[in-house]
């Protein structure tokens, strides 16, 4: 399976934004070695925003293009549909619920069969979670200190489209997320412009 192989901190510094949320990711960044302060062409800005979103969700170019094409077929605002589709990937929802401390770790958990959707094991990270779907950490993995700590430590962090049940180690996507509810700092409109040429 193909992977994004850029070192995470280096990639964050190159894009000029902490896409992985790690406190040390931007530590070595300066105005000289980050994008901040550099003048970009319109194409450069579009490309940068695409790289931000792709890297944040950990999807490859071919995968990303499929999401863009699907969004362009919708009658809704293309950028909103694009981000909503990426946000509703199973690996991302597992991360948002708090089973993992990164999307990368959540993807690994899905691949290894640690996550259930409506009681059934799903090992496809790109699986599209629908409103009403119940995402659960399999019972035998709830005793894993790392997974349990991840989940319980995020009690204060909540999103309006996810409802958590800490007793059952589960979360429900209660509705499709709106753009202003999705916690990602990116300009998806520039991405749509890039692919509309």
Curated annotation (Swiss-Prot):
Keywords: Ribonucleoprotein, Ribosomal protein, RNA-binding, rRNA-binding. This is Small ribosomal subunit protein uS4B. GO terms for cellular component: small ribosomal subunit. InterPro entries: Ribosomal_uS4 (IPR022801), Ribosomal_uS4_bac-type (IPR005709), Ribosomal_uS4_N (IPR001912), S4_RNA-bd (IPR002942), S4_RNA-bd_sf (IPR036986). Belongs to the universal ribosomal protein uS4 family. Signal peptide: none annotated. It holds the Pfam family Ribosomal_S4. GO terms for molecular function: rRNA binding; structural constituent of ribosome. The keyword ATP-binding does not apply. SUPFAM superfamilies: Alpha-L RNA-binding motif (SSF55174). Part of the 30S ribosomal subunit. Contacts protein S5. The interaction surface between S4 and S5 is involved in control of translational fidelity. Residues 88-151 form the S4 RNA-binding domain. GO terms for biological process: ribosomal small subunit biogenesis; translation. One of the primary rRNA binding proteins, it binds directly to 16S rRNA where it nucleates assembly of the body of the 30S subunit. With S5 and S12 plays an important role in translational accuracy. HAMAP family: Ribosomal_uS4_B. CDD domains: S4. The lineage of its organism: Bacteria, Bacillati, Bacillota, Clostridia, Eubacteriales.
């Amino acid at each position: 399976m193909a992977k994004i192989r850029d070192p995470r901190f280096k990639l964050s510094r190159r894009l000029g934004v902490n896409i992985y949320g790690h406190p040390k990711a931007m530590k070595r960044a300066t105005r000289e070695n980050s994008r901040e302060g550099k003048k970009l062409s319109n194409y450069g800005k579009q490309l940068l925003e695409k790289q931000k979103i792709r890297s944040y969700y950990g999807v490859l170019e071919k995968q990303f293009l499929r999401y863009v094409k699907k969004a362009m077929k919708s009658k809704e605002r293309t950028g909103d549909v694009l981000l909503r589709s990426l946000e509703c990937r199973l690996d991302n929802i597992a991360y948002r619920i708090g089973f993992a401390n990164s999307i990368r770790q959540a993807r690994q958990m899905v691949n290894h069969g640690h996550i259930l959707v409506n009681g059934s094991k799903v090992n496809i990270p790109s699986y599209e979670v629908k409103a009403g779907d119940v995402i659960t950490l399999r019972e035998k993995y709830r005793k894993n200190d790392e997974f349990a700590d991840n989940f319980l430590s995020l009690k204060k962090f909540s999103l309006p489209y996810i409802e958590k049940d800490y007793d059952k180690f589960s979360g429900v996507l209660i509705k499709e997320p709106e753009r202003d509810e999705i916690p990602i700092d990116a300009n998806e409109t520039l991405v749509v412009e890039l692919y509309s040429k």
